[in-house]
């Protein structure tokens, strides 16, 4: 059986806080609800979302600090203790991922209200949580609705929008890896999911100059691409259309660094290297990332070149069952260093 789950509503526009209650009503969600936010996103939109909901529904709130299993369990306890019927995540990737997994494990729906456009988790079924073995993608359920307020997202530092491009552009190498696994290992492959995923990547490449400006149109384009990417994963029933060797590289960096860079920044650099290994146009990918202001080197990422090399050599061990261009044995130190140097990453 192949189950596909999608958000029932995706709303993209301006000043959408007042629209939250209408979404709750249309989805026939009952009180009480739970607003999940971070210390920063509480001030950006969390408090105003809670205030708006409180006008018509019983609602509680909780602050989440990081994407860690301990925070997931904290949210689960709140859901259990207060008999919460649904949750709304107001924040970036970490807040959304924690809410996503806690809601899934508690058997309740959740709404995604992103405050940044930094990665495709805003609409996908997958969550990246630390503290569960290695930090990799954990299967949950997609949000029942996505409410993307351009005015809110536009207030985030430009770095986050550029990271969103880095996450979407990684679909290029992810789909290549997926095709490789299909050809060599007989893995299930969905042409439709792959096409939608690649369309998202092509869109940000085509519109890089607009996205660079960080205006309403640029933000809208990145959000649409991220949501399409999330939907592609739902169609595939896995993260395959948007997560290949470049994501394994990013997860390896997460393990090696005390303070990793943004997820999309790391996957963007990973995509440059993996595109080189695949023999495809890595220069165009690098040019796009430069255009939108995303880092394209270890120096710009603030990471020691030695860490980049080490991450490349251990990336294949992160998810051994996921076949990619790295193969079963991974890259030798020499091969990793060569790829990173040729592409200008180090």
UniProtKB/Swiss-Prot annotation:
It is an enzyme of class 1 (oxidoreductase). Its main location: cytoplasm. It is found in: Cytoplasm. GO terms for molecular function: glycerol-1-phosphate dehydrogenase (NAD+) activity; glycerol-1-phosphate dehydrogenase (NADP+) activity; metal ion binding. Its cofactor is Zn(2+). Zn(2+) binds at residues 167, 247, 263. The keyword NADP applies. Binds 1 zinc ion per subunit. Its EC number is 1.1.1.261. It catalyses: sn-glycerol 1-phosphate + NAD(+) = dihydroxyacetone phosphate + NADH + H(+); sn-glycerol 1-phosphate + NADP(+) = dihydroxyacetone phosphate + NADPH + H(+). Substrate binds at residues 120, 167, 251. One of its GO terms (biological process) is glycerophospholipid metabolic process. One of its GO terms (cellular component) is cytoplasm. Keywords: Cytoplasm, Lipid biosynthesis, Lipid metabolism, Metal-binding, NAD, NADP, Oxidoreductase, Phospholipid biosynthesis, Phospholipid metabolism, Zinc. Pathway: Membrane lipid metabolism; glycerophospholipid metabolism. NAD(+) binds at residues 93-97, 115-118, 124. SUPFAM superfamilies: Dehydroquinate synthase-like (SSF56796). It comes from the Archaea. InterPro entries: G1P_dehydrogenase_arc (IPR023002), G1PDH (IPR032837), Glycerol_DH (IPR016205). PANTHER family: GLYCEROL DEHYDROGENASE, GLYCEROL DEHYDROGENASE 1. Catalyzes the NAD(P)H-dependent reduction of dihydroxyacetonephosphate (DHAP or glycerone phosphate) to glycerol 1-phosphate (G1P). The G1P thus generated is used as the glycerophosphate backbone of phospholipids in the cellular membranes of Archaea. Belongs to the glycerol-1-phosphate dehydrogenase family. This is Glycerol-1-phosphate dehydrogenase [NAD(P)+]. The gene is egsA.
